[in-house]
């Protein structure tokens, strides 16, 4: 079943319905991303995330004017660099972000992607096919051939230092066969046999067993004690580097061969095809072989084989344009719906969830699945007692497929849509044009809880140690009722919480105190204004410089800011018009929470590149593209991925393609790498 089948066809949506769905999808994906990357506790399977992400991409393509600047499709989630995370692992900033791959679920979608890629590349491409290993991404840095650092993907911008743990994985070389300085990336996974042995041992010891090999690998790699990691028998495959020039190769298939020569573990199942029509045979082959492989796979990765073309195609801020992942169709099982519950999110959206008899799907025990919204529930007509098909979209998120009507109990009744909020009992509102049912009571306990969790999260105020369980305890003990109460907490109050010793209390108070000094874009994100995420908050902070300026700005002024728009401006204005918000802002100011925009460096506005729209193309010698882009942005430039009439400057390396041709047609100034060095007087 194609994951897209759950959604209303885009062509049948009204503009207002599309707008509402885009907003709700963005909220859901942001929440799920936080759970996955920050809290290591996802509430939905990967398949559900992938399906909703693909839906958001399609909606934004159909309605580009509705795409929000802070959309999950427009950025890799980012956070501030801090010394350690809640586990005690040191944070590592990735100089080149570790991007996710775009997902497709059918051969036709692969063929469609091939058409776009061929058009952008200017010619038919050969592709390197690789198995998509079901593990977690790893970055390995070598200097003069010696392993000096290993880090997890994290949120794509910041990962965790797991060097000592990785050194216990025998397959990963500590010293390369050549003294190269290079960063490579790959996958850490747990073989099926090792996973079975580990779970048997844990079961015998009375410990909780792991749901699947990926979770086991992730938990094993992120141990504070390398001795524990060593006992888990992890494995690895290496498949990528951004430094192909170091290897002296021209194709992705050659990259894999050079990795073998250097001593890296490389999966031997890759295959080069001349055209995308050949991909079906490869997919069919490994669909059959999948269950008999000694490791888990959840799809096939397709990569442009020509590295020069890869470089030319580049990346969006979220995904590479030169590669895509085909996800295997989800596994299905039959189960019985025993209950339908309703939960309230941060923005007041009330979501139905099916509670079912537990079943195993793709190695995971599943007993809950979101029913998304009242319209979806009524369209599916899911009733308590129904037998339903359950699958994992993209092998990740549990989803109810079909109701088996012939098995429906005679007394099964259509499930009523609630009239009152399950948390605060306020009357629910179904806003015209929206699919969501909302609680609009600002004092709703569920919304307050979710708002506090969001306020403390990594992308917001980044209060380490203030997770969902702590927030729940603080609320249940009446130690806090609203956001500003966090800044009045004392160590003695925190010691009354379960599992909170003096040190834990001291650490949390220190984390709360540190958050007072955050630059104001974090506070803007943390306030939870509908549609305003981290990226939009940064734009607003840079423009207004102070929270009070934003609070007092009119909707028209806000809407004129590049990348904001009228919908977000109206939401911001509506938010600050609230008396309770005005009171909250005053309280935060009284608690000395910083309201100012703190720039990381002073930009010399006289430098040649300041305020210019710049595009990079071609192969560079002295710089990598990410390094040059970072330098330009630090010095006030706006770096774009495509040439347009608004482009001020094209910086061209060697082996350039269509961007140079387009720049020349538009009369845009073009300089080379040496010109850049001369103008900037910059050293890498």
Curated annotation (Swiss-Prot):
It catalyses: NAD(+) + (deoxyribonucleotide)n-3'-hydroxyl + 5'-phospho-(deoxyribonucleotide)m = (deoxyribonucleotide)n+m + AMP + beta-nicotinamide D-nucleotide. One of its GO terms (cellular component) is cytosol. Its cofactor is Mg(2+); Mn(2+). The keyword Magnesium applies. One of its GO terms (biological process) is DNA repair. Its EC number is 6.5.1.2. It is an enzyme of class 6 (ligase). Gene3D superfamilies: 5' to 3' exonuclease, C-terminal subdomain, 6.20.10.30, BRCT domain, DNA ligase/mRNA capping enzyme, Helix hairpin bin, Nucleic acid-binding proteins. Keywords: DNA damage, DNA repair, DNA replication, Ligase, Magnesium, Manganese, Metal-binding, NAD, Zinc. GO terms for molecular function: DNA binding; DNA ligase (NAD+) activity; metal ion binding. InterPro entries: BRCT_dom, BRCT_dom_sf, DisA/LigA_HHH, DNA_ligase, DNA_ligase_AS, DNA_ligase_CS, DNAligase_adenylation, DNAligase_N. It comes from the Bacteria. Residues 604-684 form the BRCT domain. The keyword Magnesium applies. Zn(2+) binds at residues 421, 424, 439, 444. NAD(+) binds at residues 46-50, 100-101, 130, 153, 187, 303, 327. The active site is at 132 (n6-amp-lysine intermediate). NCBIfam families: dnlj, PRK07956.1. Belongs to the NAD-dependent DNA ligase family. LigA subfamily. DNA ligase that catalyzes the formation of phosphodiester linkages between 5'-phosphoryl and 3'-hydroxyl groups in double-stranded DNA using NAD as a coenzyme and as the energy source for the reaction. It is essential for DNA replication and repair of damaged DNA. This is DNA ligase. The lineage of its organism: Bacteria, Bacillati, Bacillota, Bacilli, Lactobacillales. The gene is ligA.
């Amino acid at each position: 079943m194609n994951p897209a089948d759950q959604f209303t066809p885009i062509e049948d949506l009204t503009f207002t319905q599309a707008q509402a769905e885009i907003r709700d999808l963005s909220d859901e994906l942001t929440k799920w991303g936080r759970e996955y990357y920050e809290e290591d506790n996802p509430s939905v399977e990967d398949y559900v995330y992938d399906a909703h992400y693909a839906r958001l991409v399609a909606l934004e393509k159909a309605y580009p004017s509705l795409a929000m600047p802070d959309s999950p499709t427009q950025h890799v989630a980012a956070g501030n660099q801090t010394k350690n995370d809640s586990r005690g692992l040191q944070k590592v900033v990735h100089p080149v972000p570790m991007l996710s791959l775009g997902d497709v679920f059918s051969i036709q979608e692969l063929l469609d992607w091939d058409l776009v890629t061929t058009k952008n590349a200017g010619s038919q491409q050969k592709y390197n096919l690789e198995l998509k290993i079901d593990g977690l991404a790893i970055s390995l840095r070598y200097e003069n051939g010696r392993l000096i650092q290993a880090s997890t993907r994290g949120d794509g911008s910041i990962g965790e230092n797991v060097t000592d743990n990785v050194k216990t994985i025998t397959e990963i070389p500590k010293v390369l066969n050549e003294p190269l300085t290079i960063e490579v990336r790959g996958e850490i996974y747990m073989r099926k046999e090792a996973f079975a042995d580990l779970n048997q041992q844990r079961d015998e010891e009375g410990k909780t067993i792991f749901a699947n090999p990926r979770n086991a690998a992730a938990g094993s790699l992120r141990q504070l004690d390398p001795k524990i990691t060593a006992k888990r028998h992890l494995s690895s495959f290496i498949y990528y580097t951004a430094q192909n020039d170091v290897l002296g190769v021209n194709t992705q298939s050659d990259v894999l061969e050079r990795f073998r020569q250097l001593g890296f573990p490389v999966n031997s199942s890759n295959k080069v095809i001349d055209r995308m029509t050949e991909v079906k045979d490869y997919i069919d082959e490994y669909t059959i072989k999948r269950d008999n492989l000694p490791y888990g796979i959840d799809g096939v990765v397709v990569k442009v084989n020509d590295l020069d073309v890869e470089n030319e195609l580049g990346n969006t801020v979220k995904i590479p344009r030169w590669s895509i992942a085909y996800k295997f169709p989800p596994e299905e099982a039959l189960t019985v719906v025993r209950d339908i519950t309703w939960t309230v999110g941060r923005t007041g959206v009330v979501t139905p969830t099916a509670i079912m008899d537990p079943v195993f799907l793709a190695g995971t025990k599943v007993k809950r699945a979101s029913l998304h919204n009242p319209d979806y529930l009524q369209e599916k007509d899911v009733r308590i007692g129904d037998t339903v098909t359950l699958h994992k979209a993209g092998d990740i998120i549990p989803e109810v497929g079909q109701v088996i009507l012939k098995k429906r109990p005679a007394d099964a009744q259509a499930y009523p849509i609630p009239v009152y909020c399950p948390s605060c009992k306020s009357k629910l509102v179904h806003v015209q044009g929206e699919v969501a049912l909302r609680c609009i009571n600002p004092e709703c306990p569920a919304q307050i809880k979710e708002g506090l969790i969001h306020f403390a999260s990594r992308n917001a105020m980044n209060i380490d140690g203030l997770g969902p369980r702590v927030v729940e305890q603080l609320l249940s003990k009446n130690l806090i009722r609203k956001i500003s109460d966090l800044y009045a907490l004392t160590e003695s109050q925190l010691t009354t919480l379960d599992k909170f010793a003096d040190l834990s209390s001291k650490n949390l108070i220190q984390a709360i105190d540190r958050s007072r000094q955050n630059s104001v874009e974090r506070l803007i994100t943390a306030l939870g204004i509908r549609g305003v995420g981290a990226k939009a908050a940064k734009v607003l902070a840079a423009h207004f410089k102070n929270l009070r300026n934003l609070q007092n700005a009119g909707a028209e002024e806000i809407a004129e800011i590049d990348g904001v728009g009228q919908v977000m401006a109206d939401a911001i204005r509506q938010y600050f018009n609230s008396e309770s918000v005005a009171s909250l802002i005053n309280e935060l100011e009284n608690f000395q929470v910083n309201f100012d925009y703190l720039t990381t460096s002073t930009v010399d506005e006289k430098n040649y590149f300041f305020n210019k729209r710049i595009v990079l193309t071609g192969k560079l010698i002295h710089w990598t593209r990410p390094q040059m882009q970072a330098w330009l942005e630090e010095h006030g430039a706006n770096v774009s991925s495509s040439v347009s009439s608004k482009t001020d400057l094209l910086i061209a390396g060697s082996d350039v393609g269509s961007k140079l041709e387009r720049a020349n047609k538009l009369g845009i100034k073009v300089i080379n790498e040496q010109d850049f060095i001369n103008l900037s007087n910059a050293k890498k």
